[in-house]
Amino acid sequence: MRLIHALLAIALILPVPASATVRVVATLPSLAAIAREVGGPDATVESMLPPNIDPHFADAKPSLVVTLSRADLLVENGLELEVGWLPALVQQSRNAKIATGANGRFDASTVVRRLEVPRGPVDRAQGDVHPGGNPHFLYDPRAGAAVVRALAARLAAIDPTHAAGFQSRAANVASELETFARTETAAFATLPAGHRTVVTYHRSLIYLCDWLGLTSPISVEPRPGVAPDPAHVAKVLAQLKSLPARVILQEEFYPTSTTTTLARLGAAALVSVEGGTRFDKGKRYIDHLRAISTSIRAALAK
């Protein structure tokens, strides 16, 4: 706690540049990549997490408190994806701009279509089920386009001087994402029907499947966030062979021992996708999605 307070004190005495831009902090690298494109030269953007970290279980590092203390706008995924670590960091930052309900707090989940919204009560026996719906919507460029437009409106409200720039850049990015989404949907539709069934490790790729017209009847995890047991692995293998499913999909931060074995025994390809945009490498959000769709289509076409 003393370290956090010391870091905050240093952050608060640092001067703000005369040519100050909106300081945006995004919880996820894909959100940061979106914010960077919309903000352009009128915003500085930081990502709290790299793409190879599972956002469910990120570490609440003291350095992130300092980052949040200086933010004009916090962009979060929402739907409780960051609930295990973000609230404490925001509280410790003592930054009223990014408090819940403040204009400097942008919840991307409020502007997208949600999948897998539970109809009844949710408890831990069901695994890591999110009461508001599946939070992994950033794997769908159609959702990304909605976030782009809404984020531009929020940036314009915070910095009206540069509103025209935010809106113009957002219009271009959103249009590009929507065109890309339609193109890829059409391309996947040309695959034989029997080539469009996949098995996912976690339920995090459901929006991806919805976008690309893929069927995912079973996951390697028996319940979200619960490690596979031998009985469930045997069930998955049986479905791999009977469907058949040609591809097993998983994000890079999940273990591969079980999926590698399943792929070998089930004569399926294992495709590991990036957990988010390589924001630190200067990659664009659409680059991230294009790499994923290209690798999956190539595996399904074999």
Task: Give residue ranges: language-model regions.
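Bacterial N-terminal signal peptides
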Residues: 4-15
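Extracytoplasmic metal-acquisition and chelation regions
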Residues: 20-302
